[in-house]
């Protein structure tokens, strides 16, 4: 509707936003733009829940996009340029799916979510990733073609850590976070030492 509507959001109330063309509301495909904390996202899938979250410094507004992990979420993940080699994109899709599954269902009150849409978990760009000029369809196709592929241990998805740079070698989880994960191993990563590929993060200091 036209105009502006003001809605008081009390501490015990959740405000849900739905739009046409989703699993939650029938109608033509619709895009919405959401601006939160100065960042604008274009969203196509799911629904949004707005809630007042208590923090040590007081209350703040949390906005959560509830989407289906298998496709709607993974289509919007932006952890790698979509023009990179297919094998790299396939590995990223499998790692992102595995990481998300390892966190799914574990509610975090600090964000009213299972997964942060930032580097705290995985960067979620939303529909903008899917409609990237020329290459957006490539990423969506990779996600679809690798559907169901995950990395597991004892039948459960591992926390599939990944990073853009490593300083030349990967690290053990116990050295980084204090708890052991036997599927993390120290291996050489020569690509991180290539000045042409990685000029900003070739040199690291261990502290």
Segments (PLM) and residue ranges:
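Conserved, single-site charged/polar hotspot
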Residues: 1-207
């Amino acid at each position: 509707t036209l105009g502006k509507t003001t809605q008081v959001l009390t501490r015990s109330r959740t405000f849900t936003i739905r739009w046409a063309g989703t699993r939650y509301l029938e109608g033509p495909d619709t895009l919405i733009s959401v601006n939160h904390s100065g960042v604008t996202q274009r969203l196509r899938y799911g629904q949004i829940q707005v809630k007042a979250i208590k923090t040590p410094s007081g209350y703040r507004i949390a906005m959560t996009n509830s989407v289906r992990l298998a496709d709607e979420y993974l289509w919007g993940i932006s952890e790698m340029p979509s023009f990179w080699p297919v094998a790299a994109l396939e590995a990223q899709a499998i790692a992102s799916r595995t990481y998300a599954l390892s966190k799914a269902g574990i509610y975090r009150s600090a964000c009213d979510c299972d997964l942060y849409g930032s580097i705290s978990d995985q960067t979620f760009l939303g529909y903008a990733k899917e409609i990237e000029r020329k290459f957006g369809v490539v990423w969506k196709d990779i996600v679809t073609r690798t559907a169901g592929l995950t990395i597991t241990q004892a039948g459960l998805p591992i926390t599939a850590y990944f990073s853009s740079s490593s300083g030349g070698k990967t690290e053990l989880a116990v050295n980084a976070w204090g708890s052991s994960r036997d599927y993390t191993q120290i291996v050489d990563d020569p690509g991180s030492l290539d000045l042409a590929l990685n000029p900003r993060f070739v040199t690291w200091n261990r502290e």
